[in-house]
Structures are given as C-alpha cells and as structure tokens.
Regions:
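Metalloprotease/metallohydrolase-associated module, dominated by Zn2+-dependent proteases
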Residues: 1-18, 22-37, 66-131
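Short acidic, glycine/tyrosine-flanked loop/strand segments centered on an H-E-D-like triad
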Residues: 29-56
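Active-site recognition of the HExxH zinc-binding catalytic motif
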Residues: 49-65, 72
Length: 131
C-alpha cells in the first residue's frame, strides 16, 4: 500500500478555525494566526502540545474519516494513550484549545488571508531511503 506524502500549509485563518484537511487531497492547513498567538503567549511545551494535537486530528481526517465527532474522540483517545490524561494535548483534544488557552478568545477575527507558506520537507515518507 502506498500513500502520497502529506503537505503542510500555514495560513492566517479565522480564529475559530484551528486547521483543516482539504478533503480528497494530501494537504493540511494550520492556522498560522493561532500558532503565533500560542508561541508568543505560552510555553514551548504548550505550543508543541497544540501542534501535536492539531496534526494528529487532521492526519486522521487525511485517512478519509470525515465525521468530526469521531475524529475528535479518536484524537483524544490517541493523545490520552500516548501522553496521559492530564497532558496539555489530551486536554485540548478533550475540551478544545479555546478551553485550555482562553486568551485565544481575545483575538477574534473572521479574516482569511490569501498569503500562505508551504512547509518544506514536512512528510518525507514518499522519499527513498537510498539516494
């Protein structure tokens, strides 16, 4: 079985949208606005926890699981089993990031910015081990 590598895009999105997977594609788009807020206001561990949880969630969508509630439960189960129930990633998966990072609610916007950045070398699973 072969899966095409995933592409990761950073784009400033409305603050109520953390990330999304483009259905039928290999693209995950993460909200750069939220990443910037967490990075400047929280610890590196909290930032990494957010990234882990969001990437896990969108990765599950990339397998074709479209039911949002099912993916949320799967994300929580995965975070809890790997990191423990009280880990920040598990708490965000269970209650949503806005419950864990209430300061995100201070930055309300519905604006989609056109500019985006493609993260290079995000998923190298399609590359050969022998060059």
């Amino acid at each position: 079985m072969h899966r095409a590598g995933l592409s990761l895009v950073l784009q400033r999105l409305p603050t109520k949208l953390g990330a999304y997977h483009v259905l039928g594609s290999n693209i995950i788009i993460i909200n750069r606005r939220i990443l910037d807020i967490i990075k400047t206001r929280r610890s590196l561990e909290e930032y990494n926890s957010y990234l882990f949880m969001v990437l896990c969630h969108e990765y599950l969508h990339s397998f074709g699981v479209v039911d949002e509630l099912q993916v949320r439960k799967m994300t929580y189960d995965l975070c809890q089993s790997l990191l423990g129930e009280s880990h920040t990633a598990s708490l965000m998966a269970r209650y949503e990031p806005w419950a864990v990072f209430p300061d995100l609610n201070l930055y309300q916007t519905n604006k989609f910015e056109e500019a985006f950045e493609i993260v290079k070398n995000f998923d190298r699973t399609t590359q050969s081990y022998i060059s």
